[in-house]
Amino acid sequence: MEIEKNYRINSLFEFYEPLLTNKQKAYIQLYYADDYSLGEIAAEFSVSRQAVYDNIKRTEKILEGYEAKLHLYHDFVERNHEVDAISDYIKQNYHGDTQLIKMIQQLVNLEADSE
């Protein structure tokens, strides 16, 4: 469960980072991506552990709120599932069609570039 939460928060952070304040960005980056403890972050910013904890929890809610309204992460995951399903179908049924395979790869590359 904890790994899934970390993955989700990191993913939401990638999509919605520009909408956060510098302090929110720093705390989330250090806590989730860099695996700092609350105490380490508190020492870095000369604040209490409770202040860091409150800021991180508030930012998690903000990220989830953005996702609830904008669905960027959900839509990204759904598109990837669909592209994977199409790719698998093409490989099974049209494995000799190099043009079709190339077009799907271009679609995958477009999605990767937009991250």
From Swiss-Prot:
Coiled coil feature spans: none
Domain of life: Bacteria
SUPFAM superfamilies per the UniProt record, alphabetical: Sigma3 and sigma4 domains of RNA polymerase sigma factors
InterPro entries: RNA_pol_sigma_r3/r4-like, UPF0122, UPF0122_fam_protein, WH-like_DNA-bd_sf
Pfam families: UPF0122
HAMAP family, sorted: UPF0122
Function of the protein: Might take part in the signal recognition particle (SRP) pathway. This is inferred from the conservation of its genetic proximity to ftsY/ffh. May be a regulatory protein.
Protein name (database record): UPF0122 protein lp_1634
